[in-house]
Design a protein with these regions (language model features):
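N-acyltransferase acceptor-side catalytic subdomain
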Residues: 1-395
Length: 395
């Protein structure tokens, strides 16, 4: 069908989009009440960001969702934002911004096609399977055209899928790779079965860490669904604020985000808390996908030895084994995850630069960076915790 029969529309709120139409592109399984493969591109997650004021207003993330229609039916869509800074992205372009502004002018505003504050790989150009081949180039061209028409410096599609990454170069986007750490479930029967796959030294270290973590004077409890109460969210908000202040200067998400997510996404939430006499003193919030657990936020008001490792990493592994999930994605960065069974995995992004001269300079930088990332992953493979150190087989 010719492109002329497909129209692009930009909307500034998901109130302008039907939930089932969006999820038919992003996560059709969610329409049927199942857990989505990717909970973060669903209508309800993106709408929670919007309704809670975590995006929009003075956040520096301004929604401009891009929609492709064919005969008034939604063919494809993408979570697109105009950004006035580079915070909350986890794919860093601050050096590009500084160089661009020294040489050519304003780097901001720019376009970001991403899930805000969420370094989780997945599809960014969303469409039903039968429409993906047609929707992908239409949306990509729509993103570039919107940037050009509005004289924006650049467009960035971050934490995209490998398939999108492969196709993006032919449409004028530069390719960028990075890495983060994922745990893979090799059909383990229980946590001990996982430990048995590790080298003796790593196995002993994990056992010691778990023993020390349990000596904080309380108990560790998992909550999900309707078990998560307002009291739990109050406590977790304190944890999240502490982490936000230390890492970013201020939290990215608002307090109401957690209340709305708890109401609208309860089936996809796992809250792990450390409690003393029933009072939470530390915790981690995870999102549950159809086949993966996503560790997202951690914080504490009291710091105990190894409690972070227990709550964020080992509890997540146990939960994944018990619920037969194939992997745990523990978020951005953190070489310390390697010794705890999380192996490096490639992440991908695509970048379009409006200025051709600057685009060539960035392309050269990215070529060098990809080689450096490849070397780093090779080195990390030599320090893997498993008896069999073949990283490629474990990935």
């Amino acid at each position: 069908m010719p492109k002329s029969e497909i129209t692009i529309k930009i909307v500034e709120t998901l109130l302008s989009v039907n939930e089932n139409d969006w999820d038919a592109c992003a996560a059709s399984e969610a329409i049927d009440g199942k857990r989505p493969v990717d909970p973060f591109t669903t209508y309800r997650f993106l709408r929670t960001l919007e309704d809670s004021g975590s995006v929009g207003k003075s956040s520096g993330w301004y929604p401009y969702y891009i929609l492709a229609f064919r005969e008034n039916k939604l063919l494809g869509c993408a979570p697109m934002y105009i950004k006035t800074h580079s915070q909350g992205e986890y794919i860093f372009d601050h050096a590009w911004a500084n160089a661009y502004e020294r040489a050519r002018g304003k780097y901001y505003p720019k376009i970001q096609v991403a899930v805000p504050f969420t370094p989780v790989p997945g599809k960014r150009l969303l469409a039903k399977k039968e429409n993906q081949e047609q929707a992908f180039p239409i949306l990509m061209e729509g993103i570039k055209n919107f940037a050009s028409k509005n004289n924006l410096s650049s467009a960035h599609i971050t934490f995209c899928s490998f398939d999108e990454f492969k196709k993006g170069e032919s449409l004028g986007f530069l390719k960028r790779t990075n890495s983060q750490f994922h745990w893979k479930n090799d059909n383990y029967k229980n946590f001990q079965d996982f430990l048995n796959a590790l080298s003796s030294r790593k196995r002993k270290n994990i056992k010691k860490e778990r023993e020390k973590a349990r000596n904080f004077g309380g108990k560790i409890v998992r909550y999900s669904g309707n078990e998560i109460t307002g009291k739990h969210w109050d406590a977790f908000w304190d944890f999240y604020q502490d982490t936000g202040r230390r890492k970013w200067g201020q939290p990215y998400l608002t307090r109401s985000f957690f209340d709305i997510a708890g109401k609208n996404m309860s089936n996809e939430l796992l809250l792990v808390l450390a409690e003393i006499d029933g009072n939470p003193i530390a915790g981690a919030l995870n999102f549950i996908g159809m086949d993966a657990l996503y560790g997202r936020y951690w914080g504490c008001t009291e710091n105990y030895s190894n409690l972070h490792f227990e709550i964020c990493y080992y509890q997540a592994i146990e939960y994944a084994i018990e619920n037969r999930l194939s992997r745990v994605e523990a978020g951005a960065q953190g070489d310390h995850k390697l010794a705890r069974g999380y192996l490096p995995s490639h992440t991908y992004s695509l970048h379009w630069i409006n200025d051709s001269g600057f685009s060539k300079a960035v392309a050269q930088y990215l070529d060098e960076e990809r080689r450096a990332v490849g070397r780093e992953m090779e080195i990390l493979s030599d320090y893997g915790p498993f008896k069999d150190l073949n990283l490629e087989e474990r990935k």
